[in-house]
Amino acid sequence: MPRSLLGRMLLLTLLAVLVAQGLSSLFWLSHLRSSQREGLLTSSRSLAYSMAASVSYFRSLPLGYRPLVLDQLRSMGGTRFFVSLNDRPLEMRALPDTPNKQAVLEIVQDVLHQRLGKEVELQVEFVSPDELRLFNGALKLDELPRSWAHYALTLEPVNPPVLVTQIRIGESEWLYIASLMPAPYVSLEPEGLQPQQVLSIVFTSLLLLLFTGLLMHWQSRPLKRLARAARDLALGSPSAALEERGASELVEVARAFNTMHERIDRYLNERGQLFSAISHDLRTPITRLRLRVELLEDERLQEKFGRDLDELELLVKGALQCVKDTDIHENVESVDLNLLLQHIAEPYLADGRVEVVGRAAEPYPGKPLALKRCIGNLLDNALKYGERARLSLEDGPEAVVLHVDDDGPGVPEQRLEQIFEPRFRLSPRGQGYGLGLGIARNIAHTHGGEVSLQNRREGGLRVSLRLPRLGLE
């Protein structure tokens, strides 16, 4: 199944066209064969009446006149029938039985018996021109003069079957009548699709697919613009409002997206203003409190209040840093991940605390500073708990994956997701407020990626950063 909307619509259209053309062709072919069979049976009845009239005429002639009449007919070029007198019925290989053949033979026999009498002895069969025998079986059709039989029994370039009727009209005297079926029913084979009709069906289907493809391409352009705008919004890149035009459904989607975009921008601006105000409002009373603490005479109490104020200030700075790190206003650029990793790991390469393996085949389209902060947070976390870290870069057609492995104690399985929560610490005595991994995951999300955790079998923790390549350009 194609992945694109255009490919799927073309495939569904092709299937629909094939089914429709197949059903219509079957219906048309069934109707055509029914009409052909009806016309064939009517022509057979008319031909049988003509045969019966010819037999009656020859039966009425005196015995001596019959050969003379046949000679005169041949000298005049013959009639629609080839007629001869034989002393016995000729044996010829008949054509295989088919429904049309059996129906024609039954009608011819019924008409002849009806006209000539039930007691008349006759044989009716269809024979191929190559198997046809004439004049007591001594001659083939090709051995006769063309004026004698070819007019009545051949139809070039078609090689239609010959209806041979042999009727006993006297002692050792059989009247031999051979004829083609009347046009256009010279063949007993059921009518099929002609090459011109097949070409017409193929041409119509291709034309319909072409127009459907053009229509879907035209209609899918607003969807592509919407997808591009959604990616820009996810990456924080500035983008203009979508044009609200096209089909009513597309206009409604574009309008809803523009409204959502405006609300998100307004929310981010209000959040920035709010945290700026909080930063200003909190630092002033904290500074005031520090001054008052210094005026205390009790040193023990002064130290206690100082620790609380340090913790409060660290909390405020951490919260502001979290907002700052996850709200990076950068344009998307081509980032050389190999160079970026070397730059981040350079301070630790000399003492062997960090090892970098693997390379990216192509630059990655993303935000340079945000990616640097994301990978830096992952590396700092690994060195903090494991002292050593290994950065493994894997590049593929769909995504770039960076594994950060450490030699630390690992994380309990039930707490793997809790690590990303702000202010979560595995050890109550640990320093900081657990914002690094959460910030890294948020930056990964803005690039359409993900950060996942997994305990290594040999010990330590593996943090995997997956950044998709598709759809980010």
From Swiss-Prot:
Residue intervals annotated with topology Cytoplasmic: 1-8, 219-473
Q: Which domain of life is it from?
A: Bacteria
Q: Which organism is it from?
A: Pseudomonas aeruginosa (strain ATCC 15692 / DSM 22644 / CIP 104116 / JCM 14847 / LMG 12228 / 1C / PRS 101 / PAO1)
Q: PANTHER family of this UniProt entry?
A: SENSOR HISTIDINE KINASE ENVZ (PTHR44936:SF5), SENSOR PROTEIN CREC (PTHR44936)
The subcellular localization recorded is: Cell inner membrane
Q: Which residues form the Histidine kinase domain?
A: 277-471
Question: SMART domains under this entry?
Answer: HAMP, HATPase_c, HisKA
Role: Member of the two-component regulatory system GtrS/GltR involved in the regulation of glucose metabolism and transport, as well as regulation of the exotoxin A gene expression. GtrS recognizes and binds 2-ketogluconate and 6-phosphogluconate via its sensor domain, which accelerates GtrS autophosphorylation and concomitant transphosphorylation and regulation of the response regulator GltR.
Q: Which InterPro entries match?
A: 2C_sensor_his_kinase, HAMP_dom, HATPase_C_sf, His_kinase_dom, HisK_dim/P_dom, HisK_dim/P_sf, Sig_transdc_His_kin-like_C
Q: Where are the transmembrane segments?
A: 9-29, 198-218
Identify this protein by name.
Answer: Sensor histidine kinase GtrS
Query: Which post-translational modifications are recorded for this protein?
Result: Autophosphorylated.
